């Protein structure tokens, strides 16, 4: 049975109260969903899933009653500690039971171009690994690189910088095709598979590769049979409990919820 990793990136949507409500309601609905879909229990139990609330809402996770639901941070500081107002370190995140951290997300790179690049992301990755938080390293080629046929070169260059002196068996790679953001154009499963296979070739077949790009409960099954894909980084589709439950029960056998 193939294991899938499903991480819901909540971006800047839920308030602290809404986050508390999600964890409370999720515990109830998760139990109901399992009871109503016994055919999916083996897949749910085999999968790994979590959510990434906003930084100020991470401690709401203390009310979570579903141990299988892991906590992910949307970002972290490249520095260990010091006079860095507004920053949150890996050491701090470890102390509140954060299991995963997004590193180098495309939106961070886009809106913070002076500070978010491969070099700063590399430092975040090293901090994450040091404090036993699994970094979810976001990479992807630009439209210019894609149009010029430089996808492989772009991915290779990113990985060379991001994984320098990093234990690759302690990381997850998330492929975000930058060229598709805001264009209405999404990559085909074949394109996702090609890049996923490339990432495995450049790293190791044991490194989990996720796909992040307008994934939802309606199209996720288009990607589940890709041999080199190991999971999904999901955006707005993870905000609603009913949709998220369908996402975390994803499997390559085509078994659907009732």
Swiss-Prot record:
It is found in: Cytoplasm. Its EC number is 5.3.1.1. InterPro entries: Aldolase_TIM, TIM_sf, TrioseP_Isoase_bac/euk, Triosephosphate_isomerase, Triosephosphate_isomerase_AS. CDD domains: TIM. GO terms for biological process: gluconeogenesis; glyceraldehyde-3-phosphate biosynthetic process; glycerol catabolic process; glycolytic process. GO terms for cellular component: cytosol. Keywords: Cytoplasm, Gluconeogenesis, Glycolysis, Isomerase. Belongs to the triosephosphate isomerase family. Homodimer. NCBIfam families: tim (TIGR00419). This is Triosephosphate isomerase. It comes from Mycoplasmopsis agalactiae (strain NCTC 10123 / CIP 59.7 / PG2). The gene is tpiA.
């Amino acid at each position: 049975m193939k294991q899938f990793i499903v991480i819901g990136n909540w971006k800047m949507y839920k308030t602290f109260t809404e986050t508390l409500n999600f964890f409370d309601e999720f515990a109830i609905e998760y139990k109901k969903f399992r009871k109503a879909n016994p055919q999916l229990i083996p897949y749910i139990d085999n999968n790994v899933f979590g959510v990434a609330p906003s930084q100020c809402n991470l401690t709401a996770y203390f009310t979570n009653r579903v141990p299988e639901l892991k906590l992910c941070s949307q970002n972290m500081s490249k520095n260990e500690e010091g006079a860095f107002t507004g920053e949150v370190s890996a050491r701090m995140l470890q102390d509140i039971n954060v299991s995963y951290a997004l590193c180098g997300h495309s939106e961070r790179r886009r809106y913070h171009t002076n500070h978010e690049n491969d070099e700063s992301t590399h430092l975040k990755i090293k901090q994450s690994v040091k404090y036993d938080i699994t970094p979810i390293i976001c990479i992807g080629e630009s439209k210019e690189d894609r149009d010029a046929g430089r996808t492989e070169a772009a991915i290779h260059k990113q990985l060379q910088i991001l994984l320098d002196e990093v234990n690759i068996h302690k990381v997850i790679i998330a492929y975000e095709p930058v060229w598709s953001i805001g264009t209405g154009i999404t990559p085909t499963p074949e394109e996702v598979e090609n890049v996923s296979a490339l990432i495995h070739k450049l790293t190791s077949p044991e490194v989990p590769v996720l796909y992040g790009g307008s994934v939802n409960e309606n199209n996720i099954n288009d990607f589940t049979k890709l041999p080199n894909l190991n999971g999904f980084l999901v955006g707005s589709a993870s905000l609603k409990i009913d949709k998220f439950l369908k996402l975390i029960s994803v499997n390559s056998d085509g078994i659907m919820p009732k």
